């Protein structure tokens, strides 16, 4: 469903690592969500920092325009709201071991607009406190 729609929409290159979906625990998502302070979305976990996240260093991208296609992707009201490198592995391992897991991220940069927060540390501290309060 989501996975196949994402692969089709993004015109995923068969030679690239195949995307897969790891679901967060719905109960944790509900506990962490607050309409005023958070956004529900999809965290995309990339296999690398540069090319896999659409950053050009010295080599051309294997999938030019991938970030535009990811940005335009929608599935049953969900969209990709974050790009990082760890969540799928951690959540997948938790699921395999019978633990509950969810991801809550601080968005510190907007690649599309080229904006980034210079001082995100105070916001990270607020997010940590917010998360601990929601889970306790």
PLM segments and residue spans:
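Glycine-rich phosphate- or other oxyanion-binding loops that anchor nucleotides, phosphorylated ligands
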Residues: 1-136
């Amino acid at each position: 469903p989501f996975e196949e729609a994402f692969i089709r929409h993004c015109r995923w290159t068969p030679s690239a690592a195949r995307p897969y979906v790891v679901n967060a625990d719905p109960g944790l998502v509900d506990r962490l969500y607050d309409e005023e302070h958070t956004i529900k979305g999809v965290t995309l976990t990339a296999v690398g920092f540069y090319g896999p996240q659409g950053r050009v260093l010295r080599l051309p991208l294997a999938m030019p325009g991938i970030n535009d296609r990811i940005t335009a992707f929608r599935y049953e009201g969900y969209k990709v709201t974050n790009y990082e490198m760890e969540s799928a592995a951690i959540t997948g391992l938790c699921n395999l071991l019978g633990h509950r897991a969810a991801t809550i991220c601080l968005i510190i940069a907007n690649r599309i607009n080229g904006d980034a927060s210079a001082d995100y540390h105070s916001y990270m501290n607020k997010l940590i406190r917010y998360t601990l309060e929601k889970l306790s």
